[in-house]
Regions:
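Charged, solvent-exposed interaction patches on well-folded alpha/beta domains
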Residues: 1-229
């Protein structure tokens, strides 16, 4: 009986100290400086100055004076995913009160037209509003799905062609592609076996026998039709 009383007394003492410590910790936490670490600076880098400032201002509206400990990547995703120039990003918390957003800009691959308006095609699979650009990019004709263009570009990258040598790409409803190189040679490709056809076309374009030809037609299996018109 005495042992049972001792056990009850010990249990009571343990519970008392636990309650006391919990109360103490909660009071300490509520007065802690950690809860006063409010964000007062968000630095964005990776795009041009105009875009960096614009994104930074959007973040400041959303996150200014919020506690840095309670900010997660999800707070940034909605804003950053709206910007088609962004390929990827990293967010760094710099304690006590700053955040850095490092952006990797998408690569501009080509130019195309949608509803009589020009757009860049980005490596992130998105269309980007067209503006002046100091690099020559190929023009893509036809109603393309961006993912189909990117897949075709990957095939070109595996071939002997350099993508920078291509000035125009034509996409047809059947799913077939034509390309024109910087020398003005139009290459009509088959619907299948594109890599093989591209490598054959490249060999023809550098062959002296075909130096005056302007059209290379590879649409028919095992046939090469070339003309100078």
């Amino acid at each position: 009986m005495l042992q049972q009383i001792d056990k009850k007394q010990k249990l009571f003492i343990y519970l008392f100290f636990l309650l006391l410590l919990t109360t103490f910790n909660n009071l300490s936490l509520s007065n802690s400086e950690y809860l006063k670490l409010k964000i007062n600076q968000i630095k964005v880098s990776g795009l041009n100055s105009k875009n960096n400032i614009q994104i930074s201002e959007e973040f400041n509206k959303l996150l200014h004076q919020k506690n840095i400990f309670f900010i997660s990547k999800d707070h940034f995703i909605n804003i950053l995913e709206k910007n088609n120039l962004i390929h990827s990003f990293k967010v760094r918390k710099i304690y006590p009160n700053s955040i850095e957003v490092q952006i990797k800009k998408t690569e501009l691959l080509a130019v195309t037209n949608r509803n009589n308006k020009k757009f860049f095609i980005g490596s992130n699979g998105k269309l980007i509003n067209f503006e002046s650009y100091n690099k020559s990019l190929p023009y893509v004709f036809g109603k393309i799905k961006i993912k189909d263009f990117i897949e075709f570009k990957k095939i070109i990258a595996k071939s002997k062609f350099n993508f920078e040598e291509i000035s125009e790409l034509y996409f047809f409803p059947s799913g077939r592609w034509d390309i024109k190189n910087n020398k003005g040679i139009l290459i009509k490709l088959p619907e299948t076996n594109l890599l093989k056809a591209l490598n054959l076309a490249y060999q023809i374009t550098i062959n002296e026998i075909f130096k005056n030809d302007k059209v290379i037609d590879l649409r028919i299996y095992n046939y090469v039709i070339s003309t100078n018109e």
